[in-house]
């Protein structure tokens, strides 16, 4: 049955996101570059996979010196990707399949090729002279850190045309816009509207912490930046209800939550500090890195949601860890110097876990059940590999592997014409790892992800529930309870009458299919116990579940009844990197 778009304006709280690098997804016209029509061709696949919202990396016209994050013209789709009409068609076709689409929006900076910058640099008194930040010397704002430390020496760059320095937080070919100029604010708000008018469902806001600078500060998370975000949000709420703003703010939890404001800034923020700690926890085989950061994570304001991720198009960033933990991560995951990029590790998920299927499953099971909306990165559902011999972050941006045919089925262009070579090594190459093969193989990781997402979709507690970390005697075991009691069910909760929940469910029936069992009712679990073994060896665990005495425990994927909770001390054994999702009813 085709899915349709939910009308719930808070759809993003229960959605699963999928990040698409258009350039690398599917090439419809054989020029070696993925494009919007190619993505339209693959929507059926994404619908089958069960994702709810695509996040498109920047598609605007660009010299492509930073994957399109160097915008040359905000008003045009890059010719290699198609045209505005193609985007509108993509949005319509996706919506028809129940899939929403958000686009990356780079507000902080443009390319130095942008016509605004060309004008701005031409003299000190042209109409756009103050659209960027110009100074006679490069001594200003020394407290602001350099983000791309491995390639940039300063946040100031000399422009020989204007004979002045301009400010940039990323590459020197990406000058920062001057948000103290009200014309820049207005120009950006009209660009937002221009694209929302195509039917897009919102934006991932690139590099939001850096919009303003003030003397004596780090130039991050300033009150002026938050005021601008409130303005942006109110304009969107007024004209475009149901759209979402997802902030890319690589910050510590206490600064991060400020991007939700009082539910009047961004609807979502990526949880940057949690991500590296999931990798740390499985390597140390200890839950502490995860539980520590969750303890430091403030409550979400109403209507907000975390964006959770394992990998994305950038390096696995290590900005939000201590120096000691960064050394540990480099030693464990990035030993080869070619893997280090900026302040992180440019590798895909599968090579990071040494192609271990149980470990990839464990990490995804955590991703799908921790509080937030999961954001998948294209190709990770196949356990695709990377190519550390490519420059910058291209290691993780190679073509999607569709088939074992030429160019991995990504493009009919000559190999030499491809924007990047597809993987061809014996382990991760397209002949071994591709959608066609994994789709045919019911036991593949692709099918496992698809099934997990279908289970997750049936239980809104994963998107909406609170979390309580449980004390477990074994430090290698992470356990938490997710609970969600919608307003309408509070009467049931008060009387503690959960008995009816599983009525009619014949859990003893043995399924011969490899599929997880279908639920008899939708969204019935209001209390789910999630338990993970972070160690590569089998582990016992004892949980204090006294307050759930006499409740029924049912494994969620197979609907298999486990022993009821008796006097509180509940004993479980988990296989290597094993996990359970239990409903407690
Ligand atoms: C964050 C993006 O994710 C990254 O790819 C880009 O290089 C920087 N912002 C600069 O725009
Ligand atoms: Ca193309």
Predicted stretch roles:
Residues 1-492, 498, 502-585:
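Active-site and adjacent substrate-binding regions of carbohydrate-active enzymes
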